[in-house]
Amino acid sequence: MSRPPDSEGEPIEDKSQLIEDLESGCTPRENWRIGTEHEKFPFRLSDHKRLPYEGPDGISEILSRLTRFGWQPVKERDNTIALSLEGCAITLEPGGQFELSGAPLETIHQTCDEVHTHLAQVKEVGEELGIGMLLSLIHI
């Protein structure tokens, strides 16, 4: 929650003052970036059930195997709860889904490459463990 401003400021008396105030908060065009969020729910191909955190085909095993691609584990106590790599993160969401939070990139082509690389990595690990992924959201 943000705190109230220290002062009430001066009343806006002219349209140009409002425009100037709004423009002061704009990011310069050369600093614009695109970020991707991509969620997927892992499930066992054998019985279509959701995965537990622990176990030979659990969420922790998926996260552990993704480290071979350079992802660094983020731990809470002894449990890996996320991975990070070059401005990206793979986080474990409350419903058991994985979310790729992509790096801030300059072009849509870079985000496309990032998502395709991520999906190839997840597919490789999933095939080893007999796990599929149900995609739930892509937001660019």
Where are the model-predicted features located?
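Polyanion/phosphate-binding surface patch
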Residues: 29-32, 36-41, 63-109
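"Short basic amphipathic alpha-helical interaction patches in structured regions
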Residues: 112-118
